Amino acid sequence: MDISRAEQRILHLLAQGGRIEIIRSETKKIEAASCFTRDGWLYPGFDLTLFRKLKHLKAIKSSGGHPYRITERGLRLVRAQLDNR
């Protein structure tokens, strides 16, 4: 299955140890989602529609009220990239 470039970037960040944190309204609906790198930096190219796409693909999952992390299916979807650290 092919995924978009934006989805690929987010999955790569999550595979390196990043996380997605959400903000819920009083009615328990998701209002906003933010993607953080493993170093704690906020990734600017992430929005609610991208979050919903990744959740629909079952590439991310949250358990026990913790931030969203990449799943094994998400790891299979992400292609290897050279990390220039």
From Swiss-Prot:
Protein name (database record): UPF0386 protein Arad_1912
InterPro entries noted in UniProt: YjhX_toxin
Origin superkingdom: Bacteria
Pfam families: YjhX_toxin (PF09857)
Family, per entry: Belongs to the UPF0386 family.
